[in-house]
Structures are given as C-alpha cells and as structure tokens.
Design a protein with these regions (language model features):
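Rossmann-like adenosine-cofactor binding region
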Residues: 195-271
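Adenosine-phosphate binding glycine-rich loop
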Residues: 254-255, 261-301
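Structural alpha-helical scaffold elements that stabilize or flank donor/cofactor-binding regions
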Residues: 92, 112, 209-210
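Active-site cofactor/substrate anionic-group-binding motifs, chiefly glycine-
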Residues: 42-43, 47-95
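Positively charged, low-complexity intrinsically disordered leader regions
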Residues: 1-56, 60
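Glycine-rich phosphate/diphosphate-binding loop of Rossmann-like nucleotide-binding domains
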Residues: 48-60, 142-219
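Anion-binding alpha/beta catalytic cores of soluble intermediary-metabolism enzymes, centered on
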Residues: 97-168, 259
C-alpha cells in the first residue's frame, strides 16, 4: 500500500492491518507508551477545504509519532496561481515524506499520487472520505467486538461518506443498507462495486426499511461544504431522512449511532438520539486520531 486515495483501492487485509495498528497506538497512548515511529519525518497538509478535526488530528498525530506536520492553505501554494498539480507534486516530494490533502476534486488527489514520489493521504474529497471510514470501522469493532453478522445502515445524502461507508463496510464483511432520495444517490462506480455483493447490499429511498434490524446507524449533514447555496433545496429533499426515535425503533435495541460531525441537530439527527449516542459519536471523533496515525505509520515509516 503506497497511498490512501480511496476505499475502493484497499483490500480487506489492508483495512484490518490499519485497524489493528490503530488499536495498538490507541492503547500505547492511553498507557503513556511512546511510539516515535515517524521521528524526523515531515507531513505536508494541504487544505483546499477547511476542517477543525482533520487538521488537529493529523497535526497532533504527527507530534505523537515524533514527526513534523506543516499546514499549507490554498494561499500558500502555487496551484491556485496556475502551477500544474504535477509540478507541485514533484517539488513537494523533494521536501516532504508524505502529503495529506483535503480538497474538492478526487482527480487532484490522484494527480498528486501519479506525479509525486511520496505517499499521498486523502483527507477528504467530494468523492470519498477514507480516513473517516477507517475511524468508523475502528469504532464499530471497538463497541461490537467484530464485524461478523453486523448490518450498517446509512440514511441521508449519497455523498463522500456514503460512498466510502458502502465500500469499507462491505469489504470487512458487514451488510449495508443505504436510504437516499432518488436524486441524491451514491456514485455509480460505488454502486457497481456494491452490486457484486448481492443481497448483502440494499439501496432504497425508504429510511425505515433501511434501518430494519440495523446494528449501526450512520448519517451526515444534508448540505456539505461548498453546497451552502443548496441548503434550502436540500432541506426539502431530505425531509423524512432524519435519524429519530421512529428510525431507531426499527434498528436493533443495542444499535450504535455514528456521525462524522459537525452535526446539525434537528436536521439529519434529533438532539435526543444524538445525546443518547454521544459516547459512540465522540469516541468515533477521537478514533480519527488513532486511525490516521496508523495510516501515516503504514505509509511513511
């Protein structure tokens, strides 16, 4: 594994290896055991999309691994002033040991990997969010012990989260049910991938149907960054796609709820459900740190 570009590229073995290492790193951190696995290494962090959790978790993770993280905003790079991505990739490869990029276009991430000579980590694109899904899988296994026999239900926008959850959960052996409005379905490439799993994958526009017998229920905001102009239109389209008591009544009694945050309470999830599952949601947020540290060690050590 040379890069982390999208979940579609990862094998089940690679996913499990990262989760196992993430568990180990989490244990060591909690018990004060140093792990300077990236001592002397430098990670460049490119942010075309702002983020609290991504920046803090990667920067803190590199510090705990005894490496150095360098924040690069769009204003710090020549890409915004016309330099081709392939040139930026080749220059940064001479200075850094790895790049994490959070941006809009998946192609930009793929181009960095193609033209650079160092590991590239996808911190989020409009197509996928692999770091978040690794944290989600880590959290699910932490609370449920294994993936065997579990069903994951996602309700809401068929966005980067849905795309990555479908692939990641199917690859580790879970069943997957997705409920989205017809005009907001996941990417065709992802649906084609899921089709090979037969009845382990269900696509519907009925949230209650998707939530039936679910062990894990997940949602995301209705309007992602860059879609603020569509907020009112999306509120109408996603009316009825809220995680609430009615939805949770369809899931198993001990079902988990996850949300990648930030949450818009009383839109995609009620405050009551959010607070009832806050322990799981904030453990998921913490696990971004541990999962991303595992990714960096695997790619950069």
């Amino acid at each position: 594994m040379k890069h982390l570009l999208k979940m579609l590229d990862m094998s089940q073995e690679e996913i499990i290896d990262i989760l196992n290492l993430a568990d180990q790193l989490k244990y060591e951190l909690k018990h004060g055991i140093p792990h300077p696995m990236l001592k002397g290494k430098s990670l460049g962090m490119i942010f075309q999309k702002a983020s609290t959790r991504t920046r803090v978790s990667f920067e803190t993770g590199m510090y705990q691994l005894r490496g150095h993280a360098l924040f690069l905003s769009a204003d710090d790079l020549q890409i915004g002033r016309g330099e081709p991505v392939q040139d930026t990739a080749r220059v940064l490869s001479r200075y850094l040991d790895g790049i994490m990029i959070r941006t809009f276009e998946q192609k930009e991430v793929e181009d960095l990997a193609e033209y650079g000579s160092i590991p590239i980590i996808n911190g989020l694109t409009d197509f996928c969010h692999p770091c978040q899904i690794l944290a989600d899988l880590m959290t699910i296994r932490e609370f449920k012990s294994s993936f065997d026999g579990l069903k994951m239900c996602f309700i809401g926008d068929g966005n980067n989260m849905a795309n990555s959850l479908i692939v990641g959960c199917l690859k580790v052996g879970m069943s997957v049910a997705i409920a989205c409005p017809d005009d907001y379905q996941p990417d065709k490439e992802v649906l084609d991938f899921a089709a090979q799993y037969g009845d382990k994958f269900q696509m519907t526009n009925k949230p209650l149907e998707a939530a039936k017998d679910a062990d894990v229920v997940i949602t995301d905001v209705w309007a992602s960054m860059g879609q603020e102009g569509e907020a009112e239109k999306r509120k109408k389209a996603f009316h009825g796609y809220q995680i609430n008591d009615e939805v949770m009544a369809q899931a198993h009694e001990d079902a988990m709820v996850l949300h990648c945050l930030p949450a818009h309470r009383e839109e995609e999830i009620t405050t009551k459900v959010f607070e009832a599952h806050a322990n799981e949601i904030f453990e998921e947020a913490e696990n971004r740190l541990h999962a991303q540290k595992a990714v960096m060690v695997k790619l950069m050590a």
